[in-house]
Amino acid sequence: MTGRAGTRPRTPVRRGRDAVPVLVGALVLVLAALPVERTSVPAAEAAVFRVLNGVDVLPFVLVWPVMQLGNVLVVPAAALVAAALRRWRLAVGLLLAGAGTYLAAKGIKDVVVRGRPDGLLTDVVVRGAAAQGRGFLSGHAAVAVTVLTVAWPWLGHRGRIAGVVLAAAVCLARVHVGAHLPLDVAGGAGLGLLVGSLVLLVVGRPR
């Protein structure tokens, strides 16, 4: 019989409260962008940056791989893994969110113009190659949070904890190496949550 539960097609689930992360992401993005100025850094932000940039916790050879979890190439890689596991909606969602985040980040960089920390502050410790281009917002932070947000409904408890830790590590690492200021990564995280949550509204959650 085709009416048995085991043979029913799995339809995506959409809930009204799924719009809440969209609003939270948008709020974080806006609040991070408002204090940003082209030629100066707010005193509180500079103080936080000095702490994160000045401390030596791990050697760069260990920090660098963590940062790559926010590389844009993580998106197609994660989508391929999802497809290999036959999680088709997850794979499509990751690709949509990755493309949306990339395009949105480019647009925001043209509107909220700010340079890199070493062009705005003195005595910045740059670890690895100096980052180029505009500083706000952090694409690495945006990608890491986007991937986590889209994958969230498919993750178990431990997977969610690991995902949050890794996404936070990407954000902190970008400040630590001198590539971004704190508001840059906050804005990137907000964008990632915003876009990822919007995509979940489109593709739906698994039952």
PLM region spans:
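N-terminal transmembrane-helix/juxtamembrane module of multi-pass inner/ER membrane proteins
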Residues: 1-74, 109-128
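Structural signal for the C-terminal ends of transmembrane alpha-helices
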Residues: 2-9, 81-90, 151-156, 198-204
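Interfacial segments of alpha-helical transmembrane regions
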Residues: 15-25, 78-104
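Aromatic-anchored segments of alpha-helical transmembrane domains
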Residues: 30-33, 99-107, 165-179
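Membrane-water interface at transmembrane helix exits
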Residues: 49, 105-109, 113, 152, ...
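Membrane-interface elements of multi-pass transporters and channels
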Residues: 55, 85-88, 110-119, 158, ...
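Hydrophobic alpha-helical transmembrane segments of integral membrane proteins
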Residues: 96-121, 180-194
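Membrane-embedded catalytic cores of phosphoryl/pyrophosphoryl-handling enzymes
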Residues: 122-207
